[in-house]
Amino acid sequence: MEKIVIIPTYNEKENIENILSAVFGMNQDFHVLVIDDGSPDGTADIVKNLVSKFPGQLFIEERKGKLGLGTAYIHGFKWALAKGYQFIFEIDADFSHNP
């Protein structure tokens, strides 16, 4: 059963490693897709460096500019459905709610 968590980001360098560790630490075989809206703080670079730590489980889509949270989720849902994921979850990177 393929499960994926979509995490939109914009300037989340302070949170991204912690939220990814929390999601992967749940031991639920989740895959994670980060949708980054061109964060100038290097959020996408942090995620790209972590991809090798979670091969085949962590993915990133980089968008040009800040296109908004809603469109980031829609982008992620379309990506996940095209890849055949059966369960799609969403979470904010800022820990506004626990994973």
What are these regions (language model features)?
Residues 7-21, 38:
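Active-site beta-to-alpha loop of glycosyltransferases that engages the nucleotide-sugar donor
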Residues 29-39, 61-62, 91:
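Short beta-strand/loop segment that forms part of the nucleotide-sugar
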Residues 36-45, 95:
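A conserved acidic beta->alpha catalytic loop
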Residues 2-4, 31:
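Cell-envelope/extracellular polymer assembly enzymes that use nucleotide-activated donors
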Residues 85-96:
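Short beta-strand-to-loop acidic/aromatic patch adjacent to the donor-nucleotide binding site
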Residues 21-30:
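Short, acidic, metal-binding catalytic loop of nucleotide-sugar glycosyltransferases
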Residues 44-83:
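Conserved donor nucleotide-binding strand/loop of the catalytic core
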Residues 14-18, 41-50:
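Acidic helix N-cap motif at the loop->helix transition within catalytic regions
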